[in-house]
Curated annotation (Swiss-Prot):
It comes from Mycoplasmopsis pulmonis (strain UAB CTIP) (Mycoplasma pulmonis). This is Probable transcriptional regulatory protein MYPU_6240. Keywords: Cytoplasm, DNA-binding, Transcription, Transcription regulation. GO terms for molecular function: DNA binding. It holds the Pfam family TACO1_YebC_N.
Length: 241
């Protein structure tokens, strides 16, 4: 995998210990709901739902929460909410590329908030829906190094059909094509016996990173945190090195 971001890793460790799990679970529930509405409530026949459920399980989202989100979509629970996906991108602080994935039932609220965040950060929004050239969509699985040896996880990942595995400071990063992600991740889960992963999702990975001084980097990370705290934002990607 090309590139490396120390700021992503710092945030990664912080996120693993984050007490605000309820907010994270709300975002997962929304993703599960949208996938179930679009393709039906059967996990086995709905790849998008299976992806969303596996992602939630990897972060220890309670089974009852997952079932509730699916039931809501299948009509067993009354709701009038209709969510649509929106993608925003832009630059902040000397060329850092930000990609924001959103699910919202109120476009006007979302659009107003995103514009406000970028304006206050001195950033510049690109055309809505555009994805910066530095990003490539990949299936991504990250596993704590303490849980398994490099030789063993490399053997499993290659047998699963992964295209690349990298040993980072504290974790292994495994990537594959998005189209084969469910197959690869489920093979790795079965072969390792792990049900919880640091990351298990289809992600956007940057090929180039922008290096900034610590003060500027901290401002960018504060901006990203503000985006992530928005109820309509599902994920934020950046190429801060």
């Amino acid at each position: 995998m090309a590139g490396h971001s120390k700021w992503a890793n710092i945030k990664h460790r912080k996120g693993a210990q984050d007490a605000a799990r309820a907010k994270i679970f709300q975002k997962f529930a929304k993703e599960i709901y949208v996938a179930a509405v679009a393709g039906g409530p059967d996990v086995d026949s709905n790849p998008a739902l299976r992806l969303a459920v596996n992602k939630a399980k990897s972060k220890s989202m309670p089974k009852v929460n997952i079932e509730k989100a699916i039931a809501k979509a299948s009509g067993n629970s009354k709701s009038s909410s209709t969510y649509s996906e929106y993608i925003y991108s832009g630059t902040v602080s000397k060329g850092v590329q930000i990609l924001v994935i959103c699910l919202s039932d109120n476009f006007n609220r979302l659009s107003s908030n995103i514009k406000s965040y970028f304006n206050k950060a001195g950033g510049q929004l690109s055309k809505q829906g555009s994805i910066p050239y530095v990003y490539q969509q990949k299936g991504l699985i990250e596993i704590d190094k303490k849980l398994i040896s490099e030789d063993k996880i490399t053997e499993i990942a290659l047998e699963a059909g992964a295209e690349d595995i990298q040993a980072e400071d504290n974790y292994y990063s495994i990537t594959c094509e998005p189209s084969s992600f469910n197959q690869v991740s489920e093979f790795i889960e079965k072969a390792t016996g792990f049900s919880e992963f640091l990351t298990r999702e289809v992600s956007y990975i940057a090929s180039d990173y922008v290096e900034l001084d610590d003060e500027s980097s901290e401002k960018v990370m504060a901006f990203i945190e503000k985006l992530e705290n928005d109820e309509d934002v599902q994920a934020v990607y950046h190429n801060l090195g």
